[in-house]
């Protein structure tokens, strides 16, 4: 493509990868050859994540562009080659990925991604040192989108679906999310909702927490995961189905 989708001069840490991927512009053969010995151009974690997303897309018949994978731009063509075959450009990833990860509100990006991005891959960033806990990078990669830190919101439109064996890559599905609404306990300013979630990957079992502000005695919050949600400190629970998450349905908690 032209403009900022055209190949730019990369930094030296990307040269080997892009040299191997350059052939995609004229045919997939040279790209495939470059990926055969994947250790030369991509990490095992990247390969593992790409293969998992590819299998998921095949199993669920996810069409393109709903199958588009947003990742670090230097690996973006690898993911999309495996997953959907649309690997000619990394321009969109280069424009949006870092801005998204280092913003403080993942769900504000949902409208941008809704018809453009199906999956987001996060990665370990040890070389950057301290990363604010409020960033999307930390919320997704370290906490699977859960509001486990009381003053930092979780996410309602990014569902954790996979973690690699070493935990270096996490995969999130962009979803409409289900909205839970209902009456709040008396004299409560915020309601805490919790569901137990398990995804493929070692140790990938976690409590998915969302917090909702109470207005006029009621609360409303969007959740990215299906499951049984425990409401506040009492015995109240609500079931959120897979369909509700995928279709953006509202689930009402009875009073």
Regions found by a protein language model. Name each.
Residues 3-255:
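Extracytoplasmic
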């Amino acid at each position: 493509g032209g403009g900022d989708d055209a190949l730019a001069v990369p930094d030296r840490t990307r040269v080997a990868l892009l040299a191997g991927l350059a052939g995609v512009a004229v045919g997939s053969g040279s790209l495939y050859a470059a990926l055969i010995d994947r250790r030369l151009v991509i990490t095992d974690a990247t390969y593992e994540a790409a293969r998992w997303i590819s299998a998921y897309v095949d199993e669920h018949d996810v069409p393109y562009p709903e199958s588009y994978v947003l990742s670090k731009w230097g690996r973006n063509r690898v993911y999309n080659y495996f997953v959907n075959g649309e690997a000619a450009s990394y321009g969109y990833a280069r424009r949006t990925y870092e801005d998204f990860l280092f913003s403080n509100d993942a769900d504000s990006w949902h409208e941008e991604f809704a018809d453009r991005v199906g999956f987001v891959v996060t990665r370990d960033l040890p070389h950057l040192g301290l990363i604010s806990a409020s960033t999307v990078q930390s919320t997704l990669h370290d906490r699977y989108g859960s509001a486990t830190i009381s003053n930092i919101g979780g996410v309602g439109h990014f569902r954790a679906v996979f973690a690699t064996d070493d935990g270096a890559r996490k995969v999130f599905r962009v979803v409409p999310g289900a909205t839970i609404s209902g009456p709040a306990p008396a004299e409560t300013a915020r309601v805490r909702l919790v569901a137990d979630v398990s995804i493929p990957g070692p140790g990938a079992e976690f409590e998915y927490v969302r917090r909702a502000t109470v207005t006029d005695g009621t609360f409303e919050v969007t959740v990215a995961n299906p499951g049984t949600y425990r409401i506040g400190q009492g015995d109240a629970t609500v079931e959120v189905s897979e369909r509700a998450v995928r279709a953006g349905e509202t689930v009402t908690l009875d009073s």
